[in-house]
């Protein structure tokens, strides 16, 4: 992780920034990335700044709890949960966040969740996932991992045809759950 990139992202005039602790960080760099992102979240935040989201490792992954310990700070607006396949995975994180929020004291609002659906099982459960917690504000489609599970080559042209059903199903689930729909994770 490069501190310069974190600083630049947080200084942009955008609605939201997603900092990454998952696939975008090499295993040997995870501890450094956690420290840098944790420190960045602790710095000035509030009106006029982008919302701050962090993509943590997946529920059940050995690194997820260390990720949460590093980023659960007052400057965190939300998490991006990757590779979600069941509503129970959302509920696990919801419970962890509720405990942290209770211990941390009053906040302006609860930590929000954007959910990344990246597998056929997740796609089939998308509506239940999107409605598993009031924290869920967005549903994302991770085409690369989804395609990999289907054995498809990573090819944007093929993706347009082969992923049409999955993308459409995410849109329908997101609209039915009344959450934002984000593509291209």
Residue map of PLM features:
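Expand to "…catalyze enediolate/carbanion chemistry for C-C bond making/breaking, isomerization
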Residues: 1-185
């Amino acid at each position: 992780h490069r501190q310069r990139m974190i600083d630049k992202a947080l200084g942009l005039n955008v609605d939201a920034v997603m900092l990454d602790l998952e696939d975008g960080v090499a295993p040997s760099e995870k501890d450094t990335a956690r420290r840098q992102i944790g420190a960045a979240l602790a710095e000035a935040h509030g009106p006029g700044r982008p919302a701050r989201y962090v993509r943590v490792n997946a529920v059940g992954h050995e690194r997820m709890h260390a990720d949460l310990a590093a980023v659960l700070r007052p400057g965190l607006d939300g998490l991006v949960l990757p590779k979600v396949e069941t509503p129970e995975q959302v509920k696990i994180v919801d419970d962890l966040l509720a405990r942290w929020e209770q211990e941390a004291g009053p906040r302006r609002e609860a930590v929000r969740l954007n959910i990344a659906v990246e597998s056929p099982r997740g796609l089939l459960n998308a509506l239940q996932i999107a409605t598993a917690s009031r924290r869920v504000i967005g549903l994302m489609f991770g085409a690369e991992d989804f395609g990999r599970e289907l054995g498809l080559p990573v090819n944007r042209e093929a993706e347009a045809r082969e992923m049409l059903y999955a993308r459409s199903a995410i849109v329908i689930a997101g609209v039915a759950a009344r959450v934002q729909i984000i593509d291209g994770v």
